[in-house]
From Swiss-Prot:
An example Gene Ontology molecular-function term: toxin activity
Residues that bear Leucine amide: 14
Biological function: Antimicrobial and mast cell degranulating peptide. Shows broad-spectrum antimicrobial activity against the Gram-positive bacteria S.aureus ATCC 6538 (MIC=5 ug/ml), S.saprophyticus CS (MIC=5 ug/ml), S.epidermidis CS (MIC=5 ug/ml), B.subtilis CCT 2471 (MIC=40 ug/ml), and the Gram-negative bacteria E.coli CCT 1371 (MIC=20 ug/ml), E.coli ATCC 25922 (MIC=50 ug/ml), and P.aeruginosa ATCC 15442 (MIC=20 ug/ml). Also permeates anionic liposomes. Has little hemolytic activity. Blocks the lobster neuromuscular transmission. Induces the depolarization of the muscle membrane.
Tissues in which the protein is found: Expressed by the venom gland.
GO biological process terms, semicolon-separated: defense response to bacterium; innate immune response
Similarity-based family: Belongs to the MCD family. Mastoparan subfamily.
Name by which UniProt lists this protein: Eumenine mastoparan-AF
Keywords from the named record: Amidation, Antibiotic, Antimicrobial, G-protein coupled receptor impairing toxin, Immunity, Innate immunity, Mast cell degranulation, Membrane, Neurotoxin, Postsynaptic neurotoxin, Secreted, Target cell membrane, Target membrane, Toxin
GO cellular component, one term: extracellular region
PTM note: C-terminal amidation is important for the stabilization of the secondary structure in alpha-helical conformation and for activity. The non-amidated analog eumenin mastoparan AF1 (EMP-AF1) has a lower level of alpha helical structure than the amidated peptide, as well as a reduced antimicrobial potency on both Gram-positive and Gram-negative bacteria. In addition, this non-amidated analog shows a reduced mast cell degranulating activity and is devoid of hemolytic activity.
Lineage, opening ranks: Eukaryota, Metazoa, Ecdysozoa, Arthropoda, Hexapoda
UniProt-annotated location(s): Secreted; Target cell membrane
Keyword set includes Lyase: no
Amino acid sequence: INLLKIAKGIIKSL
């Protein structure tokens, strides 16, 4: 699990 990838996904979702 990549926290950076998840964080980037959340930012992109915004």
